[in-house]
Amino acid sequence: LTLSKQTVPHFYLTVNCDLTRLSEIRERLNAHAPRDERKLPVWKLSINDFIIKAMASALRQVPDANVTWADEAIHKYHSCDVGVAVAVEGGLFTPVVRAAESKSLSQISMEMKDLAARARARKLLPSEYQGGTTTISNLGMFGIEQFTAIINPPQATILAVGAGLERFVPVKGQSVLRTQMTCALSCDHRAVDGALGAQLLAAFKTFIEEPALMLA
């Protein structure tokens, strides 16, 4: 990553995302999750599961951003393979949710739970953490409000996600308390220019703020 910071022409885009509707849908979906023989929910959706799905959906909507940069060329992909940074002792792994755009939220949730557990136990296969067309780094659980992340070559983007915080925002002329999270997209300018990066981040924001669109 040190080499990436020194050689990749990073630029950064930032947006605030309102979590009101996402939180409501998440609560309803979790309340109706199927139960196993012990009466425990088979899955429990996290905010991060929605973020993975939203990023994959955004890449599907803005396919020119679903790229990597290697050998002085842009490589385009049909599948949206989303890596997710998982902290482990002494470093991190980035297990990849393959074809996340085509998976349901519950599928992503169960798969990510398994991948994260095996990452922390250092039992991932190389094929489970190599590759990927983008990465998500979420430090919100540590109370970090905002940060920028270093691109993991040959990927051309990485999304840094901050904590969901209550803020007063203007809504129809009124100051309303809403939960928002700040997200920063780092882009490799050789493969994803400013306009393209802005389209991708705008699409991501739309899916986060209108999560029903991810269920269509």
Predicted regions and their residues:
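C-terminal catalytic/motor cores of large multi-domain enzyme assemblies
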Residues: 1-216
